[in-house]
């Protein structure tokens, strides 16, 4: 089963003045029709603007219940990440969280495909057997995503940010965003992973994290020291 609004209309670029008029945008829905991959069905499951829709939720859960595997496409919409405003929290829309919980009850074999341009809280990540973070894919990203999901390509990306457990864990939580004219940057050198590593704050996924379909093993490592120091 393929579930999620982003499978129909991919989040492939930013919003505001960064938006461009693409000559063509590939979607998972369209790519599946020519891929030869058989699916039990494809539905949106939720409204992109965050509104609850019980009929869409029920349709998605029913589809998940009669499927072997669920590919759930979700994340942040264009209005969540745009110029001229600061995000007030790091959560995905609540209607998507609610659907994740219901889908997990219907089918334990769920794979999440995330579309987001920045860090999100992930208290629901244990519901997924695997997570693929696609960021903003560009106009031809759907084909690349299918290549990874089908095993044609081995994923090799690494996180460029630390995915924290909750916003309150960040050192800037108490004074950002600013309530006055000026924003205060008090972290000093302890920005991102430097803070979490130094303070020993647990995170969901650390900076540089990323898995592939390959298992690596190193042995008999040797270091030849010349002028360098290890």
Regions from the PLM with identified roles:
Residues 1-229:
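C-terminal non-catalytic regions of proteins with extracellular/luminal or membrane-system context
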């Amino acid at each position: 089963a393929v579930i999620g609004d982003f499978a129909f209309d991919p989040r492939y670029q930013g919003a505001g003045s960064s938006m461009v008029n693409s000559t063509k945008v590939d979607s998972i829905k369209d790519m599946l029709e020519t891929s030869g991959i058989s699916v039990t069905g494809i539905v949106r499951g939720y409204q992109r603007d965050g509104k609850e829709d019980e009929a869409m939720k029920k349709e998605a859960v029913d589809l998940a219940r009669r499927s072997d595997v669920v590919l759930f496409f979700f994340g942040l919409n264009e209005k969540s990440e745009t110029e001229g405003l600061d995000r007030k929290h790091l959560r995905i829309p609540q209607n998507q969280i609610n659907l994740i919980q219901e889908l997990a009850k219907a089918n334990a074999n769920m794979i999440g495909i995330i579309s987001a341009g920045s860090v999100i809280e992930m208290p629901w990540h244990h519901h997924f057997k695997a997570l693929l973070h696609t960021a903003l894919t560009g106009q031809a990203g759907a084909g690349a995503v299918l290549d990874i999901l089908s095993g044609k390509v081995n994923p090799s990306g690494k996180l460029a940010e630390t995915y924290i457990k909750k916003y309150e864990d960040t050192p800037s939580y108490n004074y950002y965003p600013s309530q006055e004219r000026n924003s205060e940057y008090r972290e000093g050198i302890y920005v991102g992973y430097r803070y979490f590593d130094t303070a020993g704050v647990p995170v969901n996924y650390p900076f540089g994290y990323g898995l592939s379909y390959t298992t690596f093993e190193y042995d008999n490592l040797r270091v030849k020291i010349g002028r360098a120091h290890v």
